[in-house]
Curated annotation (Swiss-Prot):
It comes from Pyrobaculum arsenaticum (strain DSM 13514 / JCM 11321 / PZ6). ATP binds at residues 44-51. The gene is rfcS1. Belongs to the activator 1 small subunits family. RfcS subfamily. PANTHER family: REPLICATION FACTOR C / DNA POLYMERASE III GAMMA-TAU SUBUNIT (PTHR11669), REPLICATION FACTOR C SUBUNIT 4 (PTHR11669:SF20). This is Replication factor C small subunit 1. GO terms for biological process: DNA repair; DNA-templated DNA replication. SMART domains: AAA. Part of the RFC clamp loader complex which loads the PCNA sliding clamp onto DNA. HAMAP family: RfcS.
Amino acid sequence: MAELFWFEKYRPRSFDEVVDLEEVKARLREFVRGGNMPHLLFYGPPGTGKTTMALVLARELYGEYWRENTLELNASDERGINVIRERVKEFARTAPVGKAPFKLVILDEADNMTSDAQQALRRIMEMYAQNTRFILLANYVSRIIDPIISRCAVFRFSPMPRSLMAERLRHIAKSEGIELRDDAIDLIYEVSEGDMRKAINLLQVAAATSKVVDANAVASATTMIRPADVVELFNLAFNGDVTKAREKLRELMYVKGIAGIDFIRAFQRELIRMPLDDEVKAEIAELLAEVDYRLTQGSDEELQLLYLLSKLGAIGKRARQTPPPSKRR
């Protein structure tokens, strides 16, 4: 049997297990206590807990009968609004199991539906409002038509803060017998950008080959440059060995497939930790910002990165010729 994805394995099953979204939880708890609720619209970036919260709400509403009373649909997977209409019709024609006054339809990626399909969805929501409630999940609320928004209680889901993501990742690592280093958490958070699903999946991939997960293990699990490679490339350029630095750069670009912008982000991340004078760090930071801007404007990646290495060599040469601040007086 294939190993369960950790994201599913550690998906919260109750409001108490959800480590974020306190305001959302408070309002949804009121619906559960009252035994009734309007249609709901959850929107926000991927991996911010929309599906998880919808399923938690179903469990809290229906208890052991939550599966019988819940229909999950994906607007992107279904073959048009007619299929959704027929499935909802079939689902809604029977009474809820247990004491619940209504059934629940969870429709993911609702913002991928056309305006015409959303108009049809609005009519479906009205048609079965007596015994069915809808939870619509969307990345972008701006892509949902106003007539649907006006019929829903709207909840915004934000990326998870670093502190809470770190807490959750440490819990999972401990449960799986994994030693999770702080630098790995930093890199996972940077790569995932607060997307908890992506963060947990990345942790699982990084842990597949080692019981100790550090930043290098995380980088190896992605197309990101490893911190060790960043330091090596920087030291080669900064110490004047531009030829080897170019060879290393081309290896990382064309063998490992590292993108130009990822080099810049990696240099910026490692620069903070490097044992350099503040003046030198400031000069390098300005250089990185310059190259970053050129890359965003569509300049050739290799040429810009070679320029970066050349300038790092010049900065390193000046730094070696300049006495430290304490000896300048």
